[in-house]
Design a protein with these regions (language model features):
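Electron-transfer interface patches adjacent to heme c in soluble/periplasmic c-type cytochromes
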Residues: 24-86, 96-416, 420-434, 439-572
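Hydrophobic helical h-region of N-terminal Sec-dependent signal peptides
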Residues: 7-15
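Bacterial N-terminal signal peptides that target proteins for export
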Residues: 1-7
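C-terminal motif of bacterial Sec signal peptides marking the signal peptidase cleavage site
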Residues: 17-19
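N-terminal cofactor/phosphate-binding cores enriched in small/glycine residues
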Residues: 89
């Protein structure tokens, strides 16, 4: 549960420790710390007064202690949405069960029992040494047919398991993937593909690791398996869940301002053609997401087919936060249905395999109360299983068994209030000269080109689904926010990189408090970076990386200046 503390004095944050000789980051500024409490809200050095409030006055919590990621925004308080926020928080934190109210409906196949499993401490997951779907493991499996038939980062998702593959199932069903057969190894990088040495000019070393994931064909409880379809080559990647704090503020960034950012970057770096038409100097047709019927914050109806610019997830597959990763995940991670989600998150290949499994059929036949029991014959049960597990079957209106929505409209509304109402902790230590120096260097070496410091929210005329019936959500009008992202995808060309190659620039705000909130400070899309320095240096693994030149400049900084950049990143 959240812990609220107003005008608290920031606790001392430990500097980065890479475990590979980075003592300089531990000691560079030891003994020089002064409390920032008396400076909060004041202009100091090269920081404006507003920069203490990364989420603006309506989106920032002054709490910077353990648990601050859980805090609601001042907008929630001002709009009188505290009760809805707290009830929505419960939906995020509690374990869903198969049939015990109020959090029921788990399965038949699922990824986790709780959102908190993937977002421990409201963070983005911790690096794991093995794959088990439990608390702290924020990893999602990525399974696809590699375009090169080997291990390319690119290629279409396999169709036999869901896009976010499931490793759990409610009895008597088998999970689509047997997680006991998943093998995860972390491999040390012995040399940078770019040729950049793995020792800084002053003698300090850095280490990098990357994941290798393998899943044998026998682990798949589907018919057919992915190894029998497509090009019959199957590749695997890991993606850790995205950060959730402050996402309502990102939803409030105007589309026209994001377009201006694309136009500003397009002359200097190749942008994803799926999002930007360079010749037209405008968004590509595939940059737009088609929404269901809804309503805008000002009360204007939004008919089905309304288009919004994609901006959420690494792959930028979602537009409005209210139909974004969290709104989707509360359904597909648990497979909990609601009135506007009458279909299961499953595949036809899994449904077929379960309908053909004699042990599954026998278990259902022995339980006449099962919704899959049908006429009680093996043939009737198999037919019911095949169709009721099929992702195209309306669970509330079919000829085999009509289920009821498992999440109520009010529950879903409360969840969206919570999701849009999560705050960003205030900045820390902006009064310190080394943090001010880090800010200067961050801009000078080019990091701010992609990690754009600030945006303005304007009217925040958000879209909301019709199921909310016009109920208000937290709104962030006319706020200056400091997320440090350009809201655009770039490519880093890492070893065993992200599926699809393109990844949206991750916001840096609040990440310096990850250790205090989650117990870990892992970074990048698969948590391969164990600290800030490793995250930075992965940007220079390949000379093809969009960030190679900036990272090369970081590499040649003095040890004290490198430490200043780290201090700055941990402060914002």
């Amino acid at each position: 549960m959240k812990r609220t503390s107003i005008f608290v004095v920031v606790c001392s944050l430990a500097l980065l420790a890479s475990g590979c000789g980075h003592d300089v980051y531990e000691t560079a500024f030891a003994g020089k710390r002064e409390s920032d409490a008396k400076y909060v809200g004041q202009a100091v050095g090269n920081f404006t007064a507003d920069e203490w409030y990364p989420g603006g006055r309506l989106g920032t919590t002054l709490n910077v202690t353990e648990g601050c990621y859980e805090d609601e925004t001042p907008a929630v308080n001002e709009m009188g949405l505290d009760r809805a926020f707290n009830l929505g928080e419960a939906a995020f934190e509690r374990n869903f069960t198969i049939n015990t109210a109020p959090f029921k409906g788990l399965g038949p196949a699922y990824l986790r029992t709780s959102c908190l499993d993937c977002h421990p401490g409201y963070g983005h997951g911790k690096r794991q040494d093995y794959y088990k779907a439990g608390y702290g493991n924020g990893y999602l499996l990525v399974i696809y047919h590699p375009a090169d038939g080997a291990n390319s980062d690119d290629g279409p998702y396999v169709a036999e398991v869901t896009g976010m593959p499931q490793t759990k199932a409610a009895a008597p069903f088998l999970p689509p993937i047997d997680e006991d057969r998943i093998v995860l190894d972390w491999v040390p990088v012995t040399a940078m593909e770019s040729g950049l040495p793995m020792t800084f000019p002053d003698g300090e070393k850095y280490e990098l690791i990357y994941p290798e994931l393998s899943i044998p064909e026998e682990a798949f409880n589907t018919d057919p398996t992915p190894f029998q379809t497509g090009n019959k080559a199957v590749a695997f990647r890991l993606e850790s869940t995205i950060g959730i704090i402050g996402t309502g503020l990102l939803d409030a960034i105007p589309e026209e301002d994001i377009k201006a950012q694309y136009q500003a970057e397009a002359p200097y770096v190749a942008l994803n053609p799926a999002f930007w038409d360079k010749d037209a100097n405008d968004f590509a047709a595939t940059a737009w997401y088609t929404l269901a019927e809804g309503r805008f914050a000002d009360g204007t109806p939004a008919p089905a087919g309304t288009k919004k610019l994609k901006r959420f997830t690494y792959a930028m597959t979602r537009a409005s936060l209210q139909d974004g990763a969290g709104a989707n995940a509360i359904w597909n991670i648990t497979n909990v249905s609601r009135r506007d989600r009458p279909f299961l998150y499953t595949t036809k290949a899994w449904a077929k395999a379960m309908s053909e499994n004699p042990e599954v059929i026998a278990a259902i036949q022995a339980d006449p109360s099962s919704p899959y029991h049908a006429d009680g014959t093996p043939e009737g049960i198999a037919d019911a299983v095949l169709h009721l597990l099929d992702p195209s079957t309306n669970q509330f209106d079919n000829e085999w068994h009509n289920f009821e929505p498992e999440m109520g409209d009010d529950q879903y509304y409360n969840f969206l209030v919570w999701h849009r109402g999560l705050s960003i902790p205030r900045a820390r230590d902006l009064n310190r000269p080394e943090v001010q120096r880090g800010k200067e260097l961050f801009s000078e070496i080019g990091c701010a080109s992609c990690h754009r410091p600030s945006w303005k929210t304007k009217s925040d005329n958000y879209w909301a689904p019709a199921i909310l019936d016009g109920k208000p959500l937290p709104r962030y009008e006319e706020q200056t926010i400091w997320p440090y992202t350009d809201m655009i995808q770039h490519r880093l060309f890492m070893k065993n990189g992200i599926h699809g190659s393109w990844c949206r620039t991750t916001p840096l705000w609040g990440r310096g408090l990850s250790k205090a909130n989650t117990g870990a400070e892992d970074r990048l899309h698969d948590n391969r970076a164990r600290n800030v320095v490793e995250a930075i240096m992965w940007h220079a693994y390949s000379k093809e990386s969009d960030a190679y030149r900036s990272t090369e400049k970081f590499y040649y900084l003095s040890a004290e200046d490198r430490a200043a950049v780290v201090e700055f990143i941990n402060a914002i």
